[in-house]
């Protein structure tokens, strides 16, 4: 396979003639390039009254490889042929180099160009490209490919340094200017620089632009960036070419695999066009429920210049927002935040005059409970995560998660499987200890911008959140959101989807069909669900809506074996010798649940016993109910630093009601 390399344009802020004077001093050898052992001039001719000069050299290079490799191939050095074509009239130098040694087994071709900057005649541009085609090299093809990449990187890094060194040497000798070439008859100079036209877009990607806008990139990364940029020129329906910052993010997201990044970027560009994302900032208007009840907003800049977005997730009424906005509305809100983030990143980079490529997220989890793990809400969150990761890769620089409560390890287990591993590494977690948390935040936020709700001095303009009034709901019941079915238990697919590290789509893990059961309770009767636990420390979670009248809910642990019930109207409490404190125990206190309330909760099942969920209504009621058992293997050891701050005797979370 032919390997191709391409450098961006390097700009020397010196005239072409002075750069050529410095370039000549690197021959036959120079200390900055010890790999070059000697250069012999084999041809040197001057043409057109000295306007052109063609020089060929045979260069002897040391083999920069392990000793055993050099012994196997039988040589300590190799030879290259270099051909220089200097055009003083047009102020260009083209350099071509090919390998003489092992030319039947490997083909190396390098092309470099020096030319006057098209926009500033007092500056000089340099670009470099190379191809490496290894046909057969004694079974060491992969090793040769790695050495070729290493050599390209070294020569690219050294090239500008060498020219700068010799320009400094000339300056010390009092040479700061070299006259331009003129013909003996004082003829008008030829038009300049036709060769630069084939890389017109690369002029913008010079070394200064990279340092100022993209940060430190290796020569190989620069080459891949240019390769992907050129590939986009061939996209027919491309309305506008993405910025180099965007191209860089997609490359980084695909670990610098150009073909994968190209496919991902093209898919994203189609998605943006289909959904009019480019017009989102201008067209989107925040609904009233977002303005009044969404606890998130932009803050200041962190210490690295990244814009900071604060989300008080623990104060968010997930169910209320989802029922008011719908899945699409919540996704559109998230996309609007992402578009704002890109805008603020660019503004920060321009203002600070340094590379800023992503933003930071500060997530406050105070108040997080099992109500935030409402299944449709989880589905919406995972849909947002998948969409953002596909279309806004590497825009999240750091995620600071603060005041994480005891329920958080369960939530993290569910959600983290859908977050890219590289993105997960950007999460930093702080427990409920605010004093310790402030010290930790000081590494990333200036003290004066630490939010007041975290004990800092800075007031934020972020809404407190709270429950969304049901008058704003577009959907009045779970039936409107999930198809009702009669299946009482969820399939095992949900449990299988919670295997740590396994990434599935949101639809695979959180298909809401077959989850909720509608139950009619007659006056004075109970509804009971028996869970036989064979996995100590697994977590029982529940979510139900009271659709009519009030009811009582209690969780019991049963130590004796209970028979299967054939009649749902019969309660286990009607059995003889069924005595509280003897063979059953109240694990959660009885909760009175009012009409239209939504209840979410969880309980760590420490014992290898049965657990009984019990609903009772004195006057008859209706509810929609879902429960699930999370295996202990899915969260045990996860977030241990957070769990250590919790009481070992406390349950994972108590029931939480939202009205």
From Swiss-Prot:
An example of a Pfam family matching this protein is CRAL_TRIO
Residues forming coiled coils: none
UniProt domain GOLD: residue ranges: 512-631
A cellular-component GO term for this protein? mitochondrion
Q: Which Gene3D superfamilies match?
A: CRAL-TRIO lipid binding domain, GOLD domain
In what tissue types does this protein appear? Restricted to the developing gut and central nervous system (CNS).
Tell me where in or outside the cell this protein is found: Mitochondrion
Provide the PRELI/MSF1 domain boundaries. 3-175
Q: Which InterPro entries match?
A: CRAL-TRIO_dom, CRAL-TRIO_dom_sf, CRAL/TRIO_N_dom, CRAL/TRIO_N_dom_sf, GOLD_dom, GOLD_dom_sf, PRELI/MSF1_dom, SEC14/CRAL-TRIO_domain
**Modified residues annotated as Phosphoserine in this record:** 477
Taxonomy, superkingdom: Eukaryota
Q: Outcome of altering residue 245 to R?
A: In RNA edited version
Task: Describe the location of the CRAL-TRIO domain by residue ranges.
Answer: 286-462
Keywords annotated in UniProt: Mitochondrion, Phosphoprotein
Matching SMART domains: CRAL_TRIO_N, SEC14
PANTHER family the UniProt entry points to: PROTEIN REAL-TIME, SEC14 RELATED PROTEIN
What is the protein name for this chain? Protein real-time
């Amino acid at each position: 396979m032919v390997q191709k390399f391409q450098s961006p344009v390097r700009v020397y802020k010196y005239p072409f003639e002075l750069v050529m004077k410095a370039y000549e001093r690197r021959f036959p050898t120079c200390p900055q390039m010890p790999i070059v052992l000697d250069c012999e001039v084999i041809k040197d001719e001057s043409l057109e009254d000295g306007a052109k000069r063609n020089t060929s050299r045979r260069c002897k290079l040391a083999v920069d490889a392990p000793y055993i490799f050099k012994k196997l191939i039988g040589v300590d050095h190799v030879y290259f042929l270099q051909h220089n074509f200097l055009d003083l009239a047009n102020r260009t130098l083209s350099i071509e180099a090919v390998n003489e040694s092992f030319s039947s087994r490997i083909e190396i071709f390098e092309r470099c160009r020096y030319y006057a900057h098209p926009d500033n005649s007092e500056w000089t541009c340099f670009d470099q490209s190379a191809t490496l085609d290894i046909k057969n090299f004694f079974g060491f093809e992969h090793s040769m490919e790695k050495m070729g990449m290493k050599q390209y990187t070294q020569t690219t890094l050294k090239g500008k340094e060498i020219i700068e060194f010799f320009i400094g040497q000339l300056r010390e000798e009092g040479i700061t200017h070299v006259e331009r070439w003129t013909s003996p008859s004082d003829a008008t100079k030829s038009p300049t620089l036709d060769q630069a036209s084939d890389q017109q877009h690369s002029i913008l990607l010079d070394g200064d632009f990279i340092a100022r806008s993209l940060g430190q990139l290796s020569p190989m990364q620069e080459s891949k960036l240019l390769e992907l940029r050129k590939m986009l020129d061939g996209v027919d329906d491309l309305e506008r070419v993405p910025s180099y910052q965007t191209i860089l993010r997609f490359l980084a997201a695909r670990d610098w695999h150009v073909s994968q990044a190209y496919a991902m970027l093209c898919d994203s560009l189609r998605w943006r066009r289909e959904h009019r994302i480019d017009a989102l900032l201008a067209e989107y208007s925040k609904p009233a429920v977002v303005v009044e009840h969404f606890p998130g907003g932009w803050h200041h800049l962190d210490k690295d210049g990244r814009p900071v977005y604060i989300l008080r997730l623990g104060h968010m009424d997930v169910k209320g927002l989802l029922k008011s906005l719908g899945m699409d509305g919540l996704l559109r809100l998230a996309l609007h935040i992402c578009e704002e983030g890109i805008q603020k990143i660019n503004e920060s980079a321009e203002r600070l005059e340094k590379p800023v490529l992503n933003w930071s997220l500060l997530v406050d989890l105070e108040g997080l409970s099992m109500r935030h793990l409402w299944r449709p809400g989880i589905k919406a969150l995972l849909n947002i995560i998948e969409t953002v990761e596909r279309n806004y890769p590497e825009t999240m620089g750091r995620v600071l998660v603060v005041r994480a409560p005891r329920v958080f390890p369960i939530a993290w287990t569910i959600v983290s499987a859908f977050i890219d591993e590289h993105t997960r590494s950007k999460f930093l977690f702080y427990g409920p200890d605010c004093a310790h948390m402030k010290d930790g935040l000081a590494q990333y936020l200036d003290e004066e911008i630490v939010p007041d709700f975290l004990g800092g001095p800075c007031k934020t303009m972020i809404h407190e959140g709270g429950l969304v009034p049901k008058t704003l709901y577009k959907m009045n019941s779970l039936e409107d959101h999930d198809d009702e079915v009669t299946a009482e238990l969820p399939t095992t697919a949900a449990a299988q989807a919670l295997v740590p590290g396994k990434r599935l789509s949101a639809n695979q893990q959180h298909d809401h069909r077959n989850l909720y059961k509608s139950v009619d309770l007659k006056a004075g009767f109970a509804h009971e669900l028996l869970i036989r636990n064979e996995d100590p420390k697994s977590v029982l979670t529940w979510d139900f809506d009271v659709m009519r009248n009030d009811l009582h809910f209690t969780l019991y642990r049963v130590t004796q074996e209970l028979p299967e019930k054939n009649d749902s109207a019969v309660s286990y409490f009607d059995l003889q010798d069924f005595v509280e404190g003897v063979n059953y125990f109240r694990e959660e206190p009885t909760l009175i649940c009012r009409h239209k309330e939504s209840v979410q909760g969880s309980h760590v099942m420490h014992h290898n016993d049965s657990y009984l969920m019990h609903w009772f209504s004195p006057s008859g009621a209706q509810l929609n109910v879902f429960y699930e058992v999370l295996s202990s293997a899915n969260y045990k050891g996860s977030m241990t630093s957070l769990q250590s701050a919790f009481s070992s005797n406390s349950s994972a979370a108590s029931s939480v009601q939202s009205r």
